[in-house]
Each structure stands twice: as structure tokens, then as C-alpha cells.
Amino acid sequence: IDHDACKRLVDRSITDDRIKELVYAQIDSHGTRGLGLGSEPNQILAVALPSPIDHLLLRTPCVLHSGRYMDDLYCIALDKADLHGVLSDIRAECEKLGIVINDKKTRIVKLSRGFTYLKKRFNYGETGKVIVRPCRSAVTRQRRKLKKLAAFVERGEMTREQALQSYQSWRGSMLKLDARRTVRAMDALFSQLFG
């Protein structure tokens, strides 16, 4: 996140010069680019800075639906050409805001082909039901993590209960998705590793 863009946002929102200086110091406290994680003011700035993009999408008639979670965004429209125009508008707005778009993660796809958003794979079933599964890399990462946790337990650096708690957290999030078979396979791996 561009610090100058954040400071311009603060200038428009805060009138007290002492508070402005305090917020500026917080913005600059973690280098020249980006904001420190965990700080409430930094999280507010990170969410507020791209809000002009949200307003742009609300004013664009061809966009049927759009949404954003932190710095991830999606738009739904009927025509691919319209989406290319919207993407150009978003790029122009991002340039004004000092936001850099990751071209590797930016794409226009047919909804029927499916897409990955927030580490989840979205597809349509034959009946039109939206099927949400975990992306493959998340499952692979968890499998590796379980093996590392088993090594920690074996060396006595962690208890089995702590490993179970970590696994149950991941498992609970997977049960909200269409991932029953994945969860069963991971349960089998957990039983194999931890007995």
C-alpha cells in the first residue's frame, strides 16, 4: 500500500493536526511501502483505501454483482467485453490510489469454468448449485503441516492435544465446504500419524 495515498486519505478524513501526525508516524513505522499487520488503524486504512473502487463498481451498470474481501475483488457481468472495460477502469483507479494489481492473479473467466477466490475453488454443479471446495494447494499445505506436527510431537516439542487442536481448526473450516472426501482422507492421515 502506497503511504502517500494513505496520507491523502487521512488528510481528507482527519482535521486535528496532532492526530494526523500520529497516524502518519504509524503509517511510516514499517518501512516505505505497506502497512504493519495487526494494528487496528492500519487495517482500517487498508480496507478504506480501495473503497473508491467499490463505488466505481456500484456505478457501473454492466456489473451485476461485485464484492471485496480485504484486497481480493470479484465482479460478475454478462458480457466479457464489458468486463475488459471494467478491468481497465479498475486499473486506472488503482493507479490513482497507488495500488499495484497482481497480473498473475487477475483474470476474466466464464463462471461455468469455475474460479479460485480466497483459496477456495468455486464451480457450478449440473443442477446449477454452487460447489465450493478448497483449492488443491491448501490441502497439500495441510498434509505437510500434519507431518511436521507429528515430528514435533515425536520430539516432545508439542503435545498430541495441541496437534489435534490445530488439526480440528482446519477440519472445521473444511466441513463448511464441499470437502467431505478430503476431510475423510485427512482424518485417515491424522490417525496414521498420531494413532
Regions found by a protein language model. Name each.
Residues 1-70, 74-89, 99, 109, ...:
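Conserved polymerase palm-domain catalytic core
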Residues 29-30, 81-88, 101-195:
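Right-hand nucleic-acid polymerase module
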